[in-house]
């Protein structure tokens, strides 16, 4: 994960917030940081600004999802004994690890963390890896490791859980168009990019709250 070295000293939420502040800075300081007037062509750099800002919003979400899982697993390993870990995690580790000696003494903690990092980043053979932070992939990752889907509890004022999921799917789709086709989705403007930054900021804060509650209930 290319961002891991940069976010090692930050919490998952701080890492996401830093990336979103980069989006804010980009929108405020870029020469093309005004929408074109109706009927007028966009100025130079307007399309790239929209694309880079939206891609950064998505990156903040993906980085958060990955780092928050590792952060939560680290907390569980530091605070619980093996038999107290979530059943889903114990089942998954038993299936993934082929070396019983890796769990001798206290080395089980580092072995579990290694397995989880492989699941997120991919291993040396290019297997596993968390590719896209879609609703389905996030749910699958967290259910597999923790036996818990934080997304199911996320909603806020005037934003139902279904609407949250729809917006995540749309962000993934828009980011896919930008990254894989190099195109700017037609309806995207500066307000839209700011909207994505606000959405991801709220989403990661709510997700983090769900993980805090999960820790308290384990």
Q: What would you call each of these model-derived segments?
A:
Residues 1-55, 67-70, 78-79, 83-88:
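Charged alpha-helical initiation segments
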Residues 9-15, 19, 85, 108, ...:
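Alpha-helical structural motif
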Residues 21-27, 137-177, 190-218:
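Amphipathic, Lys/Arg-enriched alpha-helical patches that create a basic surface
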Residues 31-34, 64-76, 124, 179-186, ...:
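Long, hydrophobic, amphipathic alpha-helical segments used as structural scaffolds
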Residues 36, 40, 77-93, 188-191, ...:
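Solvent-exposed, non-transmembrane amphipathic alpha-helical segments
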Residues 43-59, 168, 186, 190-193:
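Short, charged/polar micro-motifs that form catalytic or ligand-binding hotspots
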Residues 56-57, 64-159:
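Helix-loop junctions and short alpha-helical segments
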Residues 57, 61-62, 171, 175:
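Alpha-helical transition-metal enzyme core signature, strongest for iron centers
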């Amino acid at each position: 994960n290319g961002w891991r070295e940069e976010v090692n000293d930050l919490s998952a939420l701080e890492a996401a917030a830093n990336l979103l502040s980069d989006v804010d800075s980009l929108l405020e300081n870029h020469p093309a940081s005004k929408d074109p007037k109706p009927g007028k062509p966009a100025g130079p750099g307007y399309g790239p600004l929209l694309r880079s800002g939206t891609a950064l919003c998505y990156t903040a979400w993906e980085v958060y999802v990955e780092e928050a899982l590792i952060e939560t697993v680290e907390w569980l390993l530091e605070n619980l004994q093996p038999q107290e870990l979530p059943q889903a995690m114990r089942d998954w580790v038993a299936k993934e690890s082929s070396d019983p000696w890796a769990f001798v003494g206290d080395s089980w903690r580092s072995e579990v963390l290694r397995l989880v990092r492989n699941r997120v980043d991919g291993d040396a053979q290019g297997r596993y890896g968390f590719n896209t932070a879609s609703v389905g992939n996030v749910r699958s990752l967290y259910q597999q490791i923790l036996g818990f889907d934080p997304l199911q509890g996320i909603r806020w004022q005037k934003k139902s859980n279904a609407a949250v999921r729809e917006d995540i799917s749309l962000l993934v789709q828009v980011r896919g168009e930008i990254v894989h086709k190099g195109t700017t989705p037609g309806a995207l403007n500066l307000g839209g990019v700011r909207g994505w930054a606000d959405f991801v900021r709220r989403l990661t804060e709510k997700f983090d709250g769900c993980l805090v509650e999960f820790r308290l209930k384990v």
